[in-house]
Regions:
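Cysteine-centered motifs
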Residues: 2-6
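Aromatic (phenylalanine/tyrosine) cluster motif
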Residues: 8-10, 16, 20-22, 33
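N-terminal low-complexity, intrinsically disordered patches enriched in charged
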Residues: 10-11, 371
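Hydrophobic structural segments
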Residues: 18, 27-401
Length: 401
């Protein structure tokens, strides 16, 4: 009797363990299935933070090579997606490289490995590794490259150095009173009404709208052939140009009318929260040589090319990571005492004219915080795959001192 009971209990313990194991395995499979992310989905999520559409027109950002439907294993972040970095991705089992600079900048007529660009792209394709570039999409972001430089320098009262022009649109639409909040909510969720550090910004006016449905219509209100008068709300919102299509779609989806009346206007206002470069003020003013030593220390520089000393103390500082000679004029207009950038030519230094201290700190050096910056963003947002930083210094410029 006892042996039969023991066998019965033992049998059920074994079955219970098998059942427990079965359940755990299937729960894990379910979790893993839910959390898998494709490259296309990854880019969509990245764009919620750093919209690729805010990149400069000349730039080449987004997915440069790779299958957007492939599932992500791991992500490697780098400054330049060179062949050596692609090999590093292979070793780290990363099938996505998120790079700052686009390895493909202009069109490729062939991919045979005859130069450094083709070698990197060919190796990525052969190993099924996708390359995604951000470049000026991150440059133009308020909290992008230049904001990080300002943070490292301890600047405050930050403003965009070269605000984007012809970047803002205004939408005006007319909605029955009872549906105004519904339409506004849809517009806000699509990205309209964001102005600096405020969102859901709009302006509304009450009025009377008229219309007469004719043959072929399917009116939400009224009858065919009869003129209708409706109490309506005029809603006005501002948005960035690259959001236009998504905002119009959201408005039409939420609006009750078959034919939605709306106008879109280009406005002359500069976008004060998107653009290249940034400027702000140091906590305390510095002598020029003291400032240069301060910059050398913060950026771990061996050398700084600079214009002649002005004899003025440094308080207001402008920065533009990468090639930034085009920002000298803006730095002067904003009465900056110093301007940090890179790739300035011989004649660019003449434009200082004893009014500003121009500092060329090197292209790579000026953008050196980008990899860490992206690592912090991705590590916080994505938890279903490993994110790592490239250990390879891709700076092509060397100094003999």
């Amino acid at each position: 009797g006892c042996s039969c009971i023991c066998i019965f209990i033992f049998h059920h313990i074994i079955n219970y363990n098998h059942l427990y194991e079965y359940l755990i395995i299937n729960i894990l499979k379910h979790i893993l299935f839910i959390k898998k992310m494709t490259i296309k989905h990854f880019i969509t999520e990245i764009e919620k933070i750093i919209p690729l559409a805010q990149a400069e027109d000349f730039d080449n950002v987004g997915l440069l090579c790779g299958n957007p439907e492939r599932e992500i294993t791991n992500v490697l972040i780098c400054h330049d997606a060179l062949e050596s970095v692609v090999e590093e991705a292979v070793q780290k089992n990363a099938n996505v490289i998120l790079t700052f600079h686009p390895i493909i900048f202009s069109g490729l007529k062939s991919i045979t490995g005859k130069n450094y660009v083709e070698k990197a792209v060919l190796k990525a394709i052969e190993n099924k590794i996708a390359i995604i570039a951000l470049h000026t999409a991150l440059d133009n972001h308020y909290f992008g490259v230049n904001h990080r430089i300002c943070r490292e320098l301890g600047l405050d009262q930050l403003k965009i150095l070269i605000p984007k022009k012809e970047n803002l649109l205004q939408l005006i639409t007319y909605v029955p009173v009872d549906y105004a909040e519904q339409v506004k909510k849809a517009l806000f969720e699509a990205g309209a009404g964001n102005i600096g550090f405020y969102d859901e910004c709009s302006f509304s006016i009450s009025g009377e709208g008229t219309f007469r449905p004719i043959d072929g219509s399917n009116p939400f209100l009224g009858k065919k052939g009869t003129t209708e008068k409706v109490n309506e709300i005029q809603i006005s919102v501002i948005f960035e140009k690259f959001k236009k299509n998504q905002i119009i779609s959201a408005m039409k989806f939420a609006h009750p009318y078959e034919e939605v009346a709306y106008q879109i206007y280009a406005i002359e206002n500069e976008n004060q929260y998107s653009g290249l470069g940034m400027f702000g003020e140091l906590p305390e003013e510095m002598e020029e040589k003291e400032f240069l030593n301060f910059v050398k220390e913060k950026f771990d520089l061996k050398i700084i090319r600079h214009s002649g000393f002005t004899g003025k103390k440094i308080k207001k500082v402008a920065v533009l990571g990468g090639s930034g000679a085009s920002g000298i004029k803006n730095a002067l207009q904003n009465q900056c005492d110093a301007y940090l950038t890179a790739d300035m030519k011989y004649h660019d230094f003449f434009t200082a004219e004893n009014r500003i201290l121009l500092c060329d700190i090197g292209h790579f050096e000026s953008e050196q915080f980008v990899v860490q910056q992206l690592y912090e963003i991705l590590s916080e947002k994505f938890t279903t795959f490993a994110v790592s930083k490239s250990s390879i210094n891709t700076n092509p410029v060397n100094y003999f001192l």
